[in-house]
Design a protein with these regions (language model features):
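Catalytic-core segments of enzymes that bind and process phosphorylated/nucleotide-bearing substrates
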Residues: 1-163
Length: 163
């Protein structure tokens, strides 16, 4: 992985755009709002970068200590007036997925969504068989349910309601 100083100096990382979209969806799935990831690599936060032998730079999601999948507490970053009738996890997930769709475009968002949908059952099986307490398992499964429901809503209805 690149050293912190090298990551801070990135100006034109040229990250793969689909990978960035996929990582943003992954962070949303686990309720990780404490990160920053850009195509050019500027302003990265809680994202590692590895350099392949051909010099290509690849971002890697990391530092999940504040993710609500881990803590059970949602760090709300979306505006309170965005779908206020929904609970924090649902609202935050919908808000973030809508932001991602706007940022990456319908095609990339659709491909990322399809990749996650393909793996939903495997994710659920891993959670069901993981050595975690019942409360942690319930929290993780709720994240999965909320994520996929929100993913469907954002794909079907678009990003209406964003401030």
């Amino acid at each position: 992985a690149l050293e912190d100083e090298e990551v801070a100096a990135l100006k034109n990382a040229g990250f793969d755009e689909q990978l960035v979209a996929d990582l943003q969806l992954f962070n949303t799935l686990i309720g990780n709002w404490d990160y920053a990831l850009s195509l050019d690599g500027q302003g990265l936060w809680n994202t590692e970068v590895i350099e392949l032998s051909d010099g290509k730079l690849v971002p890697v999601a990391g530092d999940f200590d504040l993710a609500s999948w881990v803590t059970g507490k949602v760090l709300v970053t979306g505006p309170r007036d965005y779908l206020p009738e929904l609970d924090d996890l649902v609202r935050q997930t919908r808000f973030r997925l809508s932001e991602i769709r706007l940022a990456v475009g319908d095609s990339r968002f659709g491909l990322a969504a399809a990749r996650f949908l393909t793996h939903r059952e495997a994710i659920e099986l891993l959670i069901a068989s993981a050595e975690i307490d019942p409360e942690g398992r319930e929290n993780a499964m709720r994240h999965v349910d909320v994520f996929f429901e929100a993913l469907s809503e954002v794909q079907v209805h678009g990003v209406d309601g964003l401030p």
